[in-house]
Design a protein with these regions (language model features):
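Sec-dependent N-terminal signal peptides
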Residues: 1-4
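N-terminal leader/linker segments that initiate helical-solenoid repeat arrays
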Residues: 7-49, 294
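Terminal, low-structured helical/coil segments at or just beyond the last alpha-helical repeat
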Residues: 20-23, 257-296
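Structural signature of tandem alpha-helical TPR/SEL1-like repeats
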Residues: 23-30, 58-67, 94-106, 130-142, ...
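Short helix-capping/linker turns of helical repeat alpha-solenoids
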Residues: 37-40, 53-55, 60, 73-76, ...
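Short N-proximal segments of mature Sec-exported proteins
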Residues: 46, 222-232, 238, 242-253
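Hydrophobic face of amphipathic alpha-helices that form TPR/SEL1-like repeat modules
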Residues: 46-53, 57, 82-89, 93, ...
Protein backbone atom coordinates (compact mmCIF):
# COMPACT_ATOMS: atom_id res chain seq x y z
CA UNK A 1 0.00 0.00 0.00
CA UNK A 2 1.34 3.43 -0.97
CA UNK A 3 1.02 6.22 1.53
CA UNK A 4 1.49 9.81 0.36
CA UNK A 5 2.84 12.37 2.76
CA UNK A 6 2.16 15.96 1.67
CA UNK A 7 4.86 18.43 2.65
CA UNK A 8 4.10 22.08 3.27
CA UNK A 9 6.32 24.81 1.84
CA UNK A 10 8.44 25.02 5.00
CA UNK A 11 8.91 21.29 5.37
CA UNK A 12 12.23 19.60 5.91
CA UNK A 13 12.57 15.89 5.64
CA UNK A 14 14.97 13.09 6.26
CA UNK A 15 15.38 10.04 4.10
CA UNK A 16 16.60 7.05 6.06
CA UNK A 17 17.27 3.61 4.69
CA UNK A 18 16.30 0.63 6.80
CA UNK A 19 19.03 -1.84 5.82
CA UNK A 20 17.40 -4.60 7.81
CA UNK A 21 14.09 -4.52 6.03
CA UNK A 22 15.10 -2.83 2.80
CA UNK A 23 12.56 -0.06 3.37
CA UNK A 24 12.90 3.65 2.72
CA UNK A 25 10.96 6.02 4.96
CA UNK A 26 10.43 9.76 4.73
CA UNK A 27 10.04 11.43 8.09
CA UNK A 28 8.63 14.91 7.87
CA UNK A 29 10.34 17.05 10.50
CA UNK A 30 7.21 19.12 10.96
CA UNK A 31 5.27 15.92 11.60
CA UNK A 32 7.95 14.76 14.06
CA UNK A 33 7.79 18.03 15.92
CA UNK A 34 4.02 17.80 16.20
CA UNK A 35 4.39 14.26 17.52
CA UNK A 36 7.08 15.40 19.96
CA UNK A 37 4.88 18.26 21.17
CA UNK A 38 2.20 15.72 22.01
CA UNK A 39 4.63 14.20 24.52
CA UNK A 40 6.20 11.32 22.60
CA UNK A 41 9.53 10.83 24.39
CA UNK A 42 11.22 8.79 21.67
CA UNK A 43 10.45 11.46 19.11
CA UNK A 44 11.70 14.20 21.42
CA UNK A 45 14.94 12.30 21.85
CA UNK A 46 15.17 11.72 18.11
CA UNK A 47 14.69 15.40 17.32
CA UNK A 48 17.30 16.37 19.88
CA UNK A 49 19.76 14.04 18.19
CA UNK A 50 18.84 15.25 14.69
CA UNK A 51 19.41 18.90 15.58
CA UNK A 52 22.60 18.07 17.49
CA UNK A 53 24.16 16.08 14.64
CA UNK A 54 22.59 17.84 11.66
CA UNK A 55 20.75 14.73 10.50
CA UNK A 56 18.55 16.01 7.69
CA UNK A 57 18.27 19.41 9.33
CA UNK A 58 20.76 22.23 9.94
CA UNK A 59 22.65 21.79 13.18
CA UNK A 60 20.94 23.77 15.91
CA UNK A 61 22.22 23.28 19.44
CA UNK A 62 19.44 25.41 20.95
CA UNK A 63 16.72 23.24 19.38
CA UNK A 64 18.70 20.14 20.31
CA UNK A 65 18.81 21.23 23.94
CA UNK A 66 15.11 22.11 23.89
CA UNK A 67 14.03 18.66 22.72
CA UNK A 68 16.42 16.79 24.98
CA UNK A 69 15.04 18.84 27.88
CA UNK A 70 11.47 17.86 27.02
CA UNK A 71 12.41 14.18 27.16
CA UNK A 72 14.53 14.69 30.26
CA UNK A 73 11.62 16.28 32.10
CA UNK A 74 9.66 13.09 31.46
CA UNK A 75 12.36 10.96 33.09
CA UNK A 76 14.26 9.74 30.02
CA UNK A 77 17.73 8.91 31.33
CA UNK A 78 19.72 9.34 28.06
CA UNK A 79 18.07 12.74 27.63
CA UNK A 80 18.85 13.70 31.23
CA UNK A 81 22.48 12.83 30.61
CA UNK A 82 22.63 14.91 27.43
CA UNK A 83 20.96 17.88 29.09
CA UNK A 84 23.48 17.66 31.94
CA UNK A 85 26.45 17.63 29.55
CA UNK A 86 25.09 20.54 27.52
CA UNK A 87 24.53 22.60 30.67
CA UNK A 88 27.99 21.71 31.93
CA UNK A 89 29.63 22.90 28.69
CA UNK A 90 27.24 25.69 27.78
CA UNK A 91 26.15 24.08 24.52
CA UNK A 92 22.74 25.20 23.26
CA UNK A 93 22.10 26.96 26.54
CA UNK A 94 23.93 29.04 29.12
CA UNK A 95 26.61 27.20 31.07
CA UNK A 96 25.22 26.21 34.45
CA UNK A 97 27.30 23.77 36.49
CA UNK A 98 24.78 23.64 39.35
CA UNK A 99 21.95 22.71 36.99
CA UNK A 100 24.24 20.18 35.29
CA UNK A 101 24.87 18.56 38.66
CA UNK A 102 21.12 18.28 39.28
CA UNK A 103 20.56 16.54 35.95
CA UNK A 104 23.54 14.22 36.35
CA UNK A 105 22.15 13.32 39.78
CA UNK A 106 18.72 12.54 38.32
CA UNK A 107 20.26 10.27 35.69
CA UNK A 108 22.46 8.65 38.32
CA UNK A 109 19.41 7.52 40.30
CA UNK A 110 18.73 4.98 37.56
CA UNK A 111 22.25 3.59 37.98
CA UNK A 112 23.61 5.10 34.76
CA UNK A 113 27.39 4.62 34.88
CA UNK A 114 28.25 7.78 32.98
CA UNK A 115 26.03 9.87 35.23
CA UNK A 116 27.40 8.26 38.39
CA UNK A 117 30.96 8.97 37.29
CA UNK A 118 30.15 12.61 36.54
CA UNK A 119 28.40 13.02 39.89
CA UNK A 120 31.51 11.59 41.52
CA UNK A 121 33.75 14.11 39.75
CA UNK A 122 31.52 17.02 40.69
CA UNK A 123 31.50 15.98 44.34
CA UNK A 124 35.26 15.40 44.30
CA UNK A 125 36.22 18.73 42.75
CA UNK A 126 33.32 20.91 43.88
CA UNK A 127 31.86 21.49 40.42
CA UNK A 128 28.29 22.75 40.69
CA UNK A 129 28.10 21.48 44.25
CA UNK A 130 30.15 21.42 47.44
CA UNK A 131 33.17 19.16 47.74
CA UNK A 132 32.20 15.92 49.45
CA UNK A 133 34.82 13.21 49.04
CA UNK A 134 32.77 10.52 50.73
CA UNK A 135 29.86 11.08 48.33
CA UNK A 136 32.33 11.19 45.46
CA UNK A 137 33.77 7.83 46.45
CA UNK A 138 30.34 6.24 46.84
CA UNK A 139 29.24 7.49 43.44
CA UNK A 140 32.42 6.30 41.74
CA UNK A 141 32.14 2.94 43.47
CA UNK A 142 28.60 2.35 42.20
CA UNK A 143 29.78 2.91 38.64
CA UNK A 144 33.00 0.95 39.18
CA UNK A 145 31.08 -2.07 40.40
CA UNK A 146 29.26 -1.98 37.05
CA UNK A 147 32.63 -2.10 35.22
CA UNK A 148 32.91 1.57 34.26
CA UNK A 149 36.67 1.84 33.68
CA UNK A 150 37.01 5.56 34.42
CA UNK A 151 35.13 5.15 37.70
CA UNK A 152 37.34 2.18 38.56
CA UNK A 153 40.38 4.41 38.10
CA UNK A 154 38.91 7.10 40.37
CA UNK A 155 38.05 4.52 43.04
CA UNK A 156 41.62 3.24 42.86
CA UNK A 157 43.04 6.75 43.13
CA UNK A 158 40.92 7.59 46.16
CA UNK A 159 41.88 4.34 47.89
CA UNK A 160 45.54 4.95 47.05
CA UNK A 161 45.50 8.52 48.40
CA UNK A 162 42.95 8.03 51.19
CA UNK A 163 40.43 10.49 49.77
CA UNK A 164 36.94 10.02 51.19
CA UNK A 165 37.95 6.57 52.38
CA UNK A 166 40.77 5.05 54.42
CA UNK A 167 43.96 4.35 52.49
CA UNK A 168 43.99 0.80 51.19
CA UNK A 169 46.81 0.07 48.74
CA UNK A 170 45.78 -3.55 48.29
CA UNK A 171 42.29 -2.67 47.09
CA UNK A 172 43.64 0.30 45.15
CA UNK A 173 45.82 -2.05 43.09
CA UNK A 174 42.83 -4.33 42.45
CA UNK A 175 40.85 -1.42 41.02
CA UNK A 176 43.81 -0.07 39.05
CA UNK A 177 44.22 -3.52 37.48
CA UNK A 178 40.52 -3.74 36.64
CA UNK A 179 40.57 -0.32 35.03
CA UNK A 180 43.79 -1.01 33.12
CA UNK A 181 42.46 -4.34 31.88
CA UNK A 182 39.54 -2.45 30.35
CA UNK A 183 41.93 -0.14 28.52
CA UNK A 184 41.94 2.95 30.74
CA UNK A 185 45.18 4.74 29.82
CA UNK A 186 45.44 6.65 33.11
CA UNK A 187 45.31 3.37 35.00
CA UNK A 188 47.82 1.72 32.65
CA UNK A 189 50.31 4.55 33.05
CA UNK A 190 50.09 4.85 36.83
CA UNK A 191 50.04 1.10 37.42
CA UNK A 192 53.06 0.82 35.13
CA UNK A 193 55.02 3.18 37.37
CA UNK A 194 54.00 1.12 40.40
CA UNK A 195 55.43 -2.02 38.81
CA UNK A 196 58.64 -0.23 37.84
CA UNK A 197 59.13 0.97 41.42
CA UNK A 198 57.55 -1.96 43.26
CA UNK A 199 54.87 0.19 44.90
CA UNK A 200 52.06 -2.02 46.21
CA UNK A 201 53.04 -4.77 43.76
CA UNK A 202 56.09 -6.97 43.22
CA UNK A 203 58.67 -5.01 41.22
CA UNK A 204 58.54 -5.96 37.54
CA UNK A 205 60.18 -3.83 34.87
CA UNK A 206 58.67 -6.02 32.16
CA UNK A 207 55.11 -5.50 33.39
CA UNK A 208 55.75 -1.84 34.10
CA UNK A 209 57.12 -1.16 30.62
CA UNK A 210 54.30 -3.15 29.03
CA UNK A 211 51.68 -0.96 30.71
CA UNK A 212 53.42 2.36 30.09
CA UNK A 213 54.12 1.54 26.44
CA UNK A 214 50.49 0.50 26.01
CA UNK A 215 49.36 3.89 27.34
CA UNK A 216 51.93 5.71 25.21
CA UNK A 217 50.76 4.04 22.00
CA UNK A 218 47.37 5.62 22.70
CA UNK A 219 48.89 9.09 22.97
CA UNK A 220 48.98 9.52 26.76
CA UNK A 221 51.22 12.53 27.65
CA UNK A 222 52.22 11.23 31.11
CA UNK A 223 53.18 7.88 29.57
CA UNK A 224 55.43 9.71 27.09
CA UNK A 225 57.07 11.47 30.04
CA UNK A 226 57.51 8.19 31.88
CA UNK A 227 59.19 6.66 28.83
CA UNK A 228 61.64 9.55 28.99
CA UNK A 229 62.39 8.66 32.60
CA UNK A 230 62.73 4.99 31.69
CA UNK A 231 65.49 5.79 29.18
CA UNK A 232 67.09 8.47 31.34
CA UNK A 233 67.37 6.17 34.35
CA UNK A 234 67.81 2.89 32.48
CA UNK A 235 64.76 1.21 34.00
CA UNK A 236 64.60 -2.15 32.25
CA UNK A 237 66.34 -0.75 29.17
CA UNK A 238 69.87 0.56 28.50
CA UNK A 239 70.28 4.24 29.38
CA UNK A 240 69.88 6.36 26.27
CA UNK A 241 69.96 10.16 26.41
CA UNK A 242 68.68 10.50 22.85
CA UNK A 243 65.57 8.44 23.55
CA UNK A 244 65.09 10.18 26.89
CA UNK A 245 65.21 13.59 25.18
CA UNK A 246 62.91 12.28 22.43
CA UNK A 247 60.18 11.21 24.85
CA UNK A 248 60.48 14.32 27.02
CA UNK A 249 60.10 16.38 23.83
CA UNK A 250 57.07 14.38 22.73
CA UNK A 251 55.53 14.73 26.20
CA UNK A 252 56.14 18.50 26.08
CA UNK A 253 54.43 18.79 22.69
CA UNK A 254 51.53 16.74 24.06
CA UNK A 255 50.98 19.17 26.90
CA UNK A 256 52.73 17.50 29.84
CA UNK A 257 53.49 20.32 32.26
CA UNK A 258 56.88 19.29 33.66
CA UNK A 259 58.33 17.48 30.62
CA UNK A 260 60.01 20.61 29.23
CA UNK A 261 62.14 20.92 32.35
CA UNK A 262 63.21 17.28 32.04
CA UNK A 263 63.97 17.71 28.35
CA UNK A 264 66.19 20.69 29.10
CA UNK A 265 67.89 18.72 31.87
CA UNK A 266 68.59 15.81 29.53
CA UNK A 267 70.13 18.19 26.98
CA UNK A 268 72.82 19.28 29.46
CA UNK A 269 74.66 15.97 29.08
CA UNK A 270 74.17 15.65 25.30
CA UNK A 271 76.25 16.75 22.34
CA UNK A 272 74.70 19.07 19.74
CA UNK A 273 74.58 16.19 17.24
CA UNK A 274 72.76 13.97 19.74
CA UNK A 275 70.24 16.73 20.45
CA UNK A 276 69.62 17.22 16.72
CA UNK A 277 69.08 13.48 16.31
CA UNK A 278 66.60 13.42 19.19
CA UNK A 279 64.76 16.43 17.79
CA UNK A 280 64.49 14.78 14.38
CA UNK A 281 63.04 11.66 15.98
CA UNK A 282 60.60 13.77 17.99
CA UNK A 283 59.49 15.59 14.82
CA UNK A 284 58.90 12.27 13.08
CA UNK A 285 56.85 11.16 16.06
CA UNK A 286 54.85 14.39 15.96
CA UNK A 287 53.98 13.72 12.32
CA UNK A 288 52.42 10.48 13.52
CA UNK A 289 50.29 12.49 15.96
CA UNK A 290 52.45 11.19 18.84
CA UNK A 291 50.96 7.72 18.47
CA UNK A 292 52.62 4.52 17.30
CA UNK A 293 56.09 6.03 17.79
CA UNK A 294 57.43 3.22 19.95
CA UNK A 295 59.52 1.83 17.08
CA UNK A 296 62.16 4.49 17.75
Amino acid sequence: MLTLVFLTWHAAYVVADDKQGGLSTISHVGFLEEKAKSGDIKTQLRLGTMYRDGQGVPRNSQKSFYWFLQAANKGNVPAQLRVAKMLERGVGTNENKAAAFIWFSKAAKSGNNDALTNVGKMHQFGIGTQIDLQKAFRSYLRAAEQNQSEAQFHVAQMLYKGLGINKDMGNAIIWFEKSANQGNVDAKNLLGTFYLKGIGVPKSTDRGLELIISAATEGHPAAFHNLGLVYQLGLGVPRNDIYAYLWFAVATKSGHQSAKRFREGAALSMTPDAINTARALASACERKNFKMCISF
